[in-house]
Amino acid sequence: MQLARIRRRVARWLAPEYEQELRETRRRLRTARRRLRKARAELEDARRYPPVFPEPLPERVAQTIEAVRGERLTYLKAGMLEDLAGCVLRLERDGVAGVVVEAGTALGGSAIVLAAAKAPERPMKVYDVFGQIPPPSERDGADVHRRYETIAAGAAKGPGGETYYGYRDDLYREVEESFARHGVPVGEHGVELVRGLFEDTIRLDEPVAFAHLDGDWYESTMTCLARLAPLLVSGGRIVLDDYYTWSGCRRAVDEYFADREGFRFERRTRLHVVRD
């Protein structure tokens, strides 16, 4: 053991760049192992539940998913977009009434998929600041604050490494144009883009059939849950985009549903909350 330590010290002294490379390799290996554990856990969770919508996606919806990913309008993988589309297609198949909501849309890709999956007459509201997201609070963990430091420093990147959506000059216009380009124009397809902070804009008084929440932090997630969960119809779903990603979102969800009955959790690739 002593000889091995001496050898390592000599190696560090003779080749410091080798030691730095070794540390970086070990760091990457640890990261890869964490990702593998997470992927395995997500796969096990997904196996516990049948697909929300077991039928093949309509061709138009499948093409929309491919198109928004091709244009890098979303951070979501194809399977996640298929899951969102399936939730809405099931509502249409089963005749479940209610508005479709997306809170936090970034470049609009997932909202465009939801709009393509729903009937044109079903109302849909898309809430976002359409700019840089607000800062986290003391209820968020260190992971969230580190992420926001990156965003605030101007170092965040878009889905393909391009300009981060929060730095765009006129994101609202870009999202509106993307809806039209993909065949679901806002004014003609029952979609309304609502600009502003969630606490100022989410004030519905009608049944909610489905909500995709992508608010990242604690306060935004808690606001969405407090305003939308009581309106969720029987069989309706809330999909939490960031439950497995950011501590603030996870804390808000766990706190909100801790003493509330009538909801069940489905731990799929993302958390689904279903109203009984």
What are these regions (language model features)?
Residues 1-67, 72-76:
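Boundary detector for helix-to-coil junctions that initiate low-complexity/charged tails
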Residues 57-78, 85, 93-276:
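S-adenosylmethionine/decaboxylated-SAM
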Residues 89:
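Internal catalytic or translocation cores that form aromatic/hydrophobic pockets or channels
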